[in-house]
Structures are given as structure tokens and as C-alpha cells.
Amino acid sequence: MDQFQTLSLLQMALNTNAIFTVATFFILWVAFRFAGKMREGESTMLGRVLITVFGLMIVWTGLLVGASRNLSFNAAASGLKAIKASGQTLSVQAEAFLTIPQISSATTTVQFSLFGDMPNVIFWLVVTVMLLSVIWMPVSAKKSS
């Protein structure tokens, strides 16, 4: 495979990842809407548990989407490094791609890692805490005027 094919496959993977990311954020918005509506009215334990499970499934999906994005970057970097090692000259853009810090540390053995991208993990951890707080924290008494 040459560098054009490698970068084209990366672009297709990133386009697919972007679609999944938008869908994940939409369904995350739905989960926060469910949690907010549940918080406004009477909530049952079953409702809280179901929304919690729904939210945790969304967080899991978000982690998978982030991990597949990193896998795509690492696979492309590994392919470009193999092309360069075979003696072919890479374009300026491909060389610039390989100088990105997260990319330059990619190994030749590409592995899927759910927790390989710490900013992604921290983001989804914060989202988890926020969602669980909306679901499980007690509602404060409203002040009457």
C-alpha cells in the first residue's frame, strides 16, 4: 500500500468516526434530557437504574469511539513508517503527520486500547460524574418567595 492509500483510508476512518461521535453526543443529550425530566418529577428506583444503565452504555460507546480514532491514527502512522522504512520517499504532508507527538510515538504493532487517550478518558469520566449526579443526587428544596 502506498502513502496515498494509507492517508485515504485514514480519512475514511476519520469521517466514519466523526459520524459516530455526532451520534454519541446526540444520544448523550437524550440521556441528560431523560435525567433532567426524571429529576423534575417523581422518580422511581427502576427509572433511576434504567437511566443510569443507559448513560453508562453511552459512556462506553464514547470510549470505544475515541479508542477507534486512536487506532486509526496509529495504524496510519505505522503504515507510513513501514513505507518510509522500505525506502520510498514520503510527501511533506505525510512527514508532517508523523511529527505529531501522539503519532510519532506509535509503534509498529498497532493495538486497540480503550484507555490509551487520557484526555478522552478524562472527558468521559467527567460526563459520567455529571450524569450520575443529575440522576442520584438529592433534589434540594426550592425556596418560596
Identify the meaning behind each predicted range.
Residues 1-14, 73-79, 83, 108:
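Membrane-interface interhelical loops and short amphipathic "cap" helices
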Residues 13-20, 45-52, 114-125:
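Alpha-helical transmembrane segments of integral membrane proteins
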Residues 99-116:
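Membrane-proximal, non-transmembrane alpha-helical segments
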Residues 39-60:
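Interfacial segments of alpha-helical transmembrane regions
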Residues 57-73:
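C-terminal TM-helix exit segments that contain a strictly Trp-centered aromatic cap at the helix terminus
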Residues 26-36, 113-145:
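Transmembrane alpha-helical segments in integral membrane proteins
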Residues 69-101:
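Juxtamembrane non-transmembrane "cap" segments at the membrane-aqueous interface
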Residues 1-33:
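Cytosolic-side membrane-entry/anchor segment at the start of a transmembrane helix
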